[in-house]
């Protein structure tokens, strides 16, 4: 088997002996991948993306300038657009009934997902949306919204009142 550095000369692998990249994987220039990470066949990873250690990246599409922190599971069919942040320990799911009918989440450009969150099958997280740490996302999140909790709900904006 060809060494990772030879297959992907423009990618930085941290401790490549402890990383497995299966066949038919595309990884963009300037991407960095942490140790103990598995990248499954068919995965497409954009340029200047960072994937932390202990991640499982299934057949999915990850955009440019994405940051996926340590211990994340990105399931088959997920689409992560450009400039997304995925906190440590985030899990995406793609099968509601465990019957093989896949319906993966989509995470739109500029979204930020707090650590330990779970994104259920078929969910769309809108552009620039923010998911609070530890949230369970069961419904689509509109662009620019902030949701927190289990089940994730929109936050209420609190504004300081001013007196004259």
State where each predicted segment sits.
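Conserved catalytic-core motifs of eukaryotic protein kinase domains, centered on the activation segment
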Residues: 95-98, 123, 157-159
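Long, charged amphipathic helices and adjacent flexible linkers at domain junctions
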Residues: 1-8
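Conserved beta-strand-loop-alpha-helix hinge in the C-terminal portion
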Residues: 143-164
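Left-handed beta-helix
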Residues: 14-17, 21-23, 28-29, 34-35, ...
């Amino acid at each position: 088997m060809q060494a990772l550095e030879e297959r992907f000369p423009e990618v930085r692998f941290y401790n490549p002996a402890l990383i497995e990249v299966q066949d038919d994987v595309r990884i963009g220039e300037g991407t960095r991948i942490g140790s103990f990470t598995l990248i499954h066949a068919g995965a497409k990873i954009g340029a200047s993306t960072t994937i932390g250690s202990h991640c499982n990246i299934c057949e999915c599409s990850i955009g440019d300038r994405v940051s996926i922190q340590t211990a994340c599971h990105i399931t088959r069919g997920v689409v992560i657009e450009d400039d997304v942040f995925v906190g440590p320990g985030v899990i995406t799911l793609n099968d509601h009934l465990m019957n093989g009918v896949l319906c993966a989440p989509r995470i739109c450009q500029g979204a930020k997902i707090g650590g330990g969150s779970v994104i259920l099958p078929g969910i769309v997280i809108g552009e620039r949306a923010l998911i609070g740490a530890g949230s369970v996302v069961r419904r689509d999140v509109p662009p620019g919204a902030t949701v927190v909790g289990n089940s994730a709900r929109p936050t209420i904006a609190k504004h300081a009142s001013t007196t004259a």
